[in-house]
Amino acid sequence: MLKGRNLLDPMDFSLEELEEVFKLADEIIEEPEKFLHLCDGKILATLFYEPSTRTRFSFEAAMLRLGGQVIGFSEPNSSSVAKGESVADTIRTVGCYADIAAMRHPKEGAPAIAAMYSDIPVINAGDGSHQHPTQTLTDLLTIRSLKGDLSNLTIGCCGDLKFGRTVHSLVKALSRYKNSKFVFMSPEELKIPDYIRKEILEKNNIEYKEVSKMEDAMAELDILYMTRVQRERFFNEDDYVRLKDSYILDGEKMKYAKKDMMVLHPLPRVNEIAYEIDQDPRGCYFKQAKYGMYVRMALIAKLLGVR
């Protein structure tokens, strides 16, 4: 039973509970008109302390398509946060008006703090460079829908693996499925964090390797998960400029890939995926964005207990 629960980390739900969410998402995709009034009278609060396009719009569209309403802010300067209000006080106040909240915050752990003080379910919509569990649900639903299974996959993660919260959450989630293998491709300065390597991969005897060239790994991958180098995580502009074009996926590199490999990207992209890949049927990142709305519809319905 997911009613009243928070989603702060992809490990918060068991595999069985994740499957519940995915099955409901399948139903919504199949017959969306059946769910147009599921959340009549319910309100979602979107508390976005960091810029967002896809995640915020996806949450808002999800609630509106369920018949609910949305309140919130898209940057903290438009709220009492600008006056120094704490996360704890903000969520207590928002809980007086809304039935569920989605929070994005630049500080790691801020949504978890909010959940401690909240009377309504809190969804982590991304906290610093830590976790992004609803993007992970999006990724898993996309893979499950297009591949048919989440087991026995070799997943390549490429780009900013140090600050890339979507990668951290995805590795944690897929590590629970049978025979997952990982290949990490990144500049030395942006390697996967030690806590992922030691606490998730090595602790659970999950096979992984790190390579410097994309071409060295492409042939074995079932999934290639591309990420951008995030300018907003750098203190030094020179470092960003030096690293931002380290890995670029283009048609030449795709020649090494399996015919059924999937290219995913949490978006936004900068130039790490060439536009020519948009015409390749293996480029699934815009399908992935659409699945994001459906899985958030299912998640909201489950946490509110209306399904």
From Swiss-Prot:
Which reactions fall under this protein's catalytic activity? carbamoyl phosphate + L-aspartate = N-carbamoyl-L-aspartate + phosphate + H(+)
What is the protein name stated in its UniProt record? Aspartate carbamoyltransferase catalytic subunit
Q: How does it assemble?
A: Heterododecamer (2C3:3R2) of six catalytic PyrB chains organized as two trimers (C3), and six regulatory PyrI chains organized as three dimers (R2).
**At which positions is L-aspartate bound?**
83, 165, 228
Stated family: Belongs to the aspartate/ornithine carbamoyltransferase superfamily. ATCase family.
- Report the protein's function: Catalyzes the condensation of carbamoyl phosphate and aspartate to form carbamoyl aspartate and inorganic phosphate, the committed step in the de novo pyrimidine nucleotide biosynthesis pathway.
UniProt lineage: Bacteria, Bacillati, Bacillota, Clostridia, Eubacteriales
Q: Which residues bind carbamoyl phosphate?
A: 54-55, 104, 132, 135, 267-268
**Source species of the chain:** Clostridium botulinum (strain 657 / Type Ba4)
Please name the pathway: Pyrimidine metabolism; UMP biosynthesis via de novo pathway; (S)-dihydroorotate from bicarbonate: step 2/3
